[in-house]
Structures are given as structure tokens and as C-alpha cells.
Amino acid sequence: MANRLKEKYTNEVIPALTEKFNYSSVMAVPKVDKIVINMGVGEAVNNAKTLEKAAAELALISGQKPLITKAKKSIAGFRLREGVAIGAKVTLRGERMYEFLDKLVSVSLPRVRDFHGVPTKSFDGRGNYTLGVKEQLIFPEINFDDVDKVRGMDIVIVTTANTDEEGRELLKGLGMPFAK
């Protein structure tokens, strides 16, 4: 069964973007390449259990096992040593990526308190979009009673778009609720 968002991309977004930006080929139309979800757990320096809990939550949210990230260099001010595990990340591609994006746009973002749309200024100049989420409770897989601490995460949506305008139109076509 094809994903709902992927079908929308094929049937609606590609023709709309081709018409707006006059692409010569269907292959020139921007698409979502991957989604990277990163959860930095600073308190993992003192307590390794918090990182395990965060990684388990990230696995529930994304549907795949996260990669544990380690500190690249020592920083005395943060009492951090090189090689210490301080976070977890997941890279989603293909079917899982579309499923996550669909869930993010239609279920999770509307559950954010006082939500007025995601900021339009979070593009990086190359059509990629970065979104910060303050709490993991917006995802339906997370059980409120099992949460020991509210943790945020960074969600980076990497597209093949060359400009921010193309990336914005692609994500808007896929249903991303940008602030007016």
C-alpha cells in the first residue's frame, strides 16, 4: 500500500511545482530526500539511564532504532569528555520518512500548545527545513504516564530543492502548516 503523502506528492505536488517553477523534467522537481531527528540529552553525562529512555522514546516516535551520538571533543565548562554518549539520532528515508512526515503534519503539530503554524524563517538557504520541537508528548506513540522528563528534539527535513522558495512550496504542498 502506497503512503497517502507519497500519492499526494506524485498526483498533486509534482504538477503544481512543475507549473510554478517551469521544470523541464519530472526529475528536476524537488522532493524530500531524508528526515533526521536528533535528540540531544545533556544530562546523559551524569546519568546514562536518561539517554536510554530518550533513545527508547525516539525509537517509538520514528519506528527505527536510533544511533547514539558521542561528544566529538571535551568541553570543561560542560563537564564533558570526548567519546561520552550525549544524544541519539535517527535518519528516515523512503516509506518510513513519508509516514513520519504525514504523522508530523496531520497529528503531532496540531497537538502543540498555542500552535499558530511553523516559522517560515527556518530554511537554511538550500531548501532544507529545520524544526525544533519542545516536547516529545505531541507524538501519539508517547504515553504520558511513561514520560520521566519532557525532552525536545530537532527535526531536519532535507530536500533536493535548490532554493528556500522551492523548498517552502514543496513542504506547503505536502501540508506543512506555515505561519501566516
UniProtKB/Swiss-Prot annotation:
GO terms for molecular function: rRNA binding; structural constituent of ribosome; tRNA binding. Keywords: Ribonucleoprotein, Ribosomal protein, RNA-binding, rRNA-binding, tRNA-binding. Pfam families: Ribosomal_L5, Ribosomal_L5_C. It comes from the Bacteria. One of its GO terms (cellular component) is ribonucleoprotein complex. InterPro entries: Ribosomal_uL5, Ribosomal_uL5_bac-type, Ribosomal_uL5_C, Ribosomal_uL5_CS, Ribosomal_uL5_dom_sf, Ribosomal_uL5_N. Belongs to the universal ribosomal protein uL5 family. NCBIfam families: PRK00010.1. Part of the 50S ribosomal subunit; part of the 5S rRNA/L5/L18/L25 subcomplex. Contacts the 5S rRNA and the P site tRNA. Forms a bridge to the 30S subunit in the 70S ribosome. This is Large ribosomal subunit protein uL5. It comes from Streptococcus thermophilus (strain ATCC BAA-491 / LMD-9).
